Amino acid sequence: MARISFSCLFPASWHCSLPSVTQFSRQRVALLIISVAVFILVFAAVADLQLWSSRAFRDRQFRRYLDQIEDLEATDTKDTKLNYGVVVDCGSSGSRVFVYFWPPHNGNPHDLLDIKQMRDRGSKPVVKKIKPGISTMALTPEKSSDYINPLLSFAASYIPKHKHKETPLYILCTAGMRILPESQQIAILQDLVKDVPQEFDFLFSEAHAEVISGKQEGVYAWISINFVLGRFDHVVDEEDAVVAVTIGTQEESIIRKRTVGVIDMGGGSLQIAYEVPTTMTYPSVEHEEVAKSMLAEFNLGCDLQHTEHVYRVYVTTFMGFGGNFARQRYEDMVFNDTITKNRIQGQQIGVHPNSPLQDPCLPVGLIDQVRRQSHDLHVLGKGNWDSCRQQLEPLLLKSNDTQAYLNSVYQPSIDFSNSEFYGFSEFFYCTEDVLRMGGIYNSQKFAKAAKEYCSMPWTTLQDRFNSGLYSSHADQHRLKYQCFKSAWMFSILHNGFHFPHEYPNFKTAQLVYDKEVQWTLGAILYKTRFLPLRDIRQESSRPAHVSWFRISFVYNHYLFFACILVVLLSIVLYILRLRRIHRRQARASALDLLLMEEGVHTVLEPGIPT
């Protein structure tokens, strides 16, 4: 190959030579340029896809924000496409009616109805409560429909009249009705089923009026919380926590959003509900029977063949483990123990005000009396939080086995490395009303604050209360029993349910997205789960047609870059083909030259003298 040399008066080692720029080198340069261009285009495509994904994520976040804002706006009853539903919660102390609405289903069998609570023109929730409870109609069941009439009239006034005939009505009775004999329950429900349709045009049948169990109520509450938090939306974003779920005998696990567990401590009872994602094994038939009575497996989807909305939830209610009832149990225990010790040891502790029993669960210096069986036990607050927790340990009634279950009730294990829980009612009041620590729970900070509160003199707490240093919801009852209830909450959470002290995913709350969430939302979600089938069938019966406007923006990008790659690949193949043709021509020229040289030698050979 010919070479082009550059020489100058430099040292010999500086002399250099460059290959001649031939057609081959030009092809190599062109191929290199095309390769770089392809790399740049592919890089741009990947970057654009990531940018699109980021924008899509921000769009979803923005839509969620808009949905939260829309939830607080007045319901547009002029929208003829809206559907409505009514749920009456017949509780022990009173009954409440809730009105819900939802737009037409989007036609995707994997999505649930978008049910929201109706709001009036002032953007207030449409809800009405009456007292006393419907259980007071036990002796006069024929008046049950008259009792509930004001609630239904209230709901009917907010729902467009032409929508009444297609609006389902559910009357669900809870604790107050459960304690009645079955005959009285049936008499009340029969009167409702007979008389309500004569007064109102709602969709209402015998199956729409029932007394639900505590287990059902817990499941509905669990559904409500997770629905509002968006945990049933199976579009998983990068920041969403997921869990692998096994359903029945399926070998492959379903990967979906992690649901939250719910712990609710009221005044009289304690309830816990959480998903059990894996199929359980039991050491004995007895354990299996007990576990099945506390597990609820249900499908929230409209298609029973689809298992992505099948959930297995553990629900248990502990009667007597609420904050106020636990205090009564504690006072009973202290009273009986003190009377017994006084009788055995001949002492007079607590009998007179000048020799009170020191109670570690009351603030320092607080004077109180416990009356049982016409006897008074005088107590004086000692304010020792650790000692209080020790005295509360027997009230947990834990089993003697290795699991040490709360109240000796079986509980499936919780994966504390991949779970999340919300604490409501007393959990929120204990952390927020006085300690002002509601929200994300930290056991060390909570224990420190609780100890400091308990050790404060009662007079100091009164001064702080009068100065407005506590929540507006705090009252004298809260100040008096905060020390006890904080110790009880701590014991329930860590000694009863065995939550690790460093567990990071427990939150105490009163509202979810600034609104109160009722179990009735979960009830209507479950009751109306098959309604989307109607919209899906209507959608499938329409003639299919293609709309270019429905093609995703990202697909256009894919098509654009695919076309560019095809063109570049064609250019590369064309250049390679030219190279092969050029090589063939070069070989042919070399062969011709060789043949010509051989021919010359052949001609010259005869004339050469020997």
UniProtKB/Swiss-Prot annotation:
The active site is at 217 (proton acceptor). It holds the Pfam family GDA1_CD39. Signal peptide: none annotated. Disulfide bonds join 454-483. It is an enzyme of class 3 (hydrolase). One of its GO terms (cellular component) is cytoplasmic vesicle membrane. The chain crosses the membrane at residues 29-49, 556-576. It catalyses: a ribonucleoside 5'-triphosphate + H2O = a ribonucleoside 5'-diphosphate + phosphate + H(+); UTP + H2O = UDP + phosphate + H(+); GTP + H2O = GDP + phosphate + H(+); CTP + H2O = CDP + phosphate + H(+). It comes from the Eukaryota. One of its GO terms (molecular function) is metal ion binding. Its EC number is 3.6.1.15. Its cofactor is Ca(2+); Mg(2+). PANTHER family: ADENOSINE/GUANOSINE DIPHOSPHATASE, ECTONUCLEOSIDE TRIPHOSPHATE DIPHOSPHOHYDROLASE 7. Belongs to the GDA1/CD39 NTPase family. This is Ectonucleoside triphosphate diphosphohydrolase 7. It comes from Xenopus tropicalis.
